[in-house]
Amino acid sequence: PNPQPNPQPQPDPKPQPKPQPDPKPNPDPKPNPQPQPSSGVFDFEWIEKVDKSYAVHVTKTLNGVTLDATARTDTQEQNQDYAIQGKGLVLDGRRGQITITFPEGVKSISFDYKAFLAGNKKREILVSGGGISDIVSVGTDKQTYTKTLNKTGNVEITIKGNSGSKQFVIDNIKWTR
């Protein structure tokens, strides 16, 4: 008999995939921008320097919103604490101001307020910016100022004492956007 030549190996009808190396994490992933929370509160509990001077500068950015203030940070006077809830800021008609910048707009803003020290002297808060121009009378009991704005884009709100106002305390500045 005639010897058969060695048959050529036939290609596999289904090619086998080549082994792949273990996937490595992307060394430089592009971060997905995370949406900022749609609300927040400045409660002033982060203030470290408690001072009777009305020239104390405090600043804080929370969820993309920046508070910049010059105020008194000591809410105590004559052995009495006039704080609303923990720490707060004291302003009057001559000294102190709070500016809040909302770079992505603001739907609503609110804050708590009350008189600092006793007496029936005039105490008024001037709230301005973002289409607001409000004068708010201040009493000895805690009250809450609330305003709906529905503003987009960069909005700056200022809280300060109206001309001639005596001292008052501000706390718990809240917003939604």
What is the predicted role of each segment?
Residues D81-I109, K142-T144:
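Short beta-strands within extracellular/lumenal beta-sheet-rich domains
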Residues I47, P103-V106, D112-A118:
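Solvent-exposed strand-to-loop "edge" motifs in beta-rich extracellular domains
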Residues I125-V127:
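Short beta-strand elements bearing conserved aromatic residues within extracellular beta-rich modules
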Residues P1-S38:
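Ser/Thr/Gly/Pro-rich low-complexity, disordered linker/stalk segments of secreted
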Residues G40-V58, N120, G129-R177:
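Terminal, low-complexity interaction segments
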Residues P27-A69:
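Extracellular carbohydrate-recognition regions
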